[in-house]
Amino acid sequence: MDRLLRIYNKEERLVVGLMSGTSADGIDAALVKVKGRGLDTKVELLEFEKFPYEEEVQKKIFELFDPHTGTVEKICHMNFLLGELFAEATLKLIKKAGLTPKDIDLIGSHGQTIYHIPNFIEDMGYKVRSTLQIGEPAVIAERTGIVTVADFRVRDVAAGGQGAPLVPYTEYILYRSPNETIALQNIGGIGNVTVLPKGGSIEDVIAFDTGPGNMVIDEVVKRITHGKMNFDKDGELASRGKVNEEFLAELLKDEFFKMKPPKTTGREHFGKNYVDNLMKKASYLEIDKYDLVATVTALTAYSVVRSYEKFIFPYYKVDKVVIGGGGSFNKTLVQMIKKQLPQVRVITQEDIGFNSDAKEAVAFAILASETINGNFNNIPKATGAKHPVVMGKISL
């Protein structure tokens, strides 16, 4: 415990944040200097790198997403294999920064989400929500020699929350403003928004998932290119097509878009089975491949904007929207969102000097630091939890 106490007493810490998102394309690793604690925390990004998964690793991860191929044996094995990969990424990042593991105080690892069940299931008299992230933190701690904080989401779920979104706590620390109301729109595999009312407290923050981000677009692109492309770089394919308005209207009837916040979603809803059905309908309608990419890109854009129109604009006058995540590099997608929000300034993380790719890795570095501080680091209004909790399990 002396080791934890030494870290606790430090006013300035070096923390590595690790993130592998729903796209499962690699590990985002950020080296962060964290000063202070609580809502007055100050953060400086010192180093960042993305470590892409080898094709074989990504294939094995995707097998875990499907209940038909994700056996207990495979999950058990991949939990430890991913722990090795997370540790390796950490050590490479530290070396790149010209430091040694002894210079680092903490690691905050999100892990890899394998399955997420945000809605209650009645079973044996219990109402149960659940979520599963792998990438064994004990392996990370063992290989690096660094205290590792991980498995954040389960504590929020245990308190009745959906275990997501978690980034709003850190977004309040980093982006809040006394002068303007800001909507932070992350577009990773799934899209999610955080609204920071001007001059508001952390209790005023609202956040929820808006629907698919890059997930459906990526899967459609893989299929129409027969695996030659994994995503639509710069939105180039979508820019060649025309949105099929009839099909888009059908897609927007999905029940998720009607749900009120707090709400979360994931690959369980908008993953392989969803795209299987989507491709069948597109084939029946004889939709051109470029038109199809344009249409599913519009699905993401429209789901974002409609979420604002239903759940944000009636209550807040948003001054600007800041888009982050991999979707911020999709020029066609960003342009679609801008076109539908002419009354709001729409910019990207890069426009304000932040790194879209690093954002979530930085967030888990901050959350880990707050775990050590013993501070609440969820926002119940965003996740639906009954009360604030300290998220994160510690491996020494």
From Swiss-Prot:
Pathway: Amino-sugar metabolism; 1,6-anhydro-N-acetylmuramate degradation; Cell wall biogenesis; peptidoglycan recycling. CDD domains: ASKHA_NBD_ANMK (cd24050). InterPro entries: Anhydro_N_Ac-Mur_kinase (IPR005338), ATPase_NBD (IPR043129). It holds the Pfam family AnmK. The keyword Ion transport does not apply. Keywords: ATP-binding, Carbohydrate metabolism, Kinase, Nucleotide-binding, Transferase. GO terms for biological process: 1,6-anhydro-N-acetyl-beta-muramic acid catabolic process; amino sugar metabolic process; peptidoglycan turnover. ATP binds at G21, T22, S23, A24, D25, G26, I27, D28. SUPFAM superfamilies: Actin-like ATPase domain. Its EC number is 2.7.1.170. The keyword Kinase applies. Catalyzes the specific phosphorylation of 1,6-anhydro-N-acetylmuramic acid (anhMurNAc) with the simultaneous cleavage of the 1,6-anhydro ring, generating MurNAc-6-P. Is required for the utilization of anhMurNAc either imported from the medium or derived from its own cell wall murein, and thus plays a role in cell wall recycling. This is Anhydro-N-acetylmuramic acid kinase. The gene is anmK.
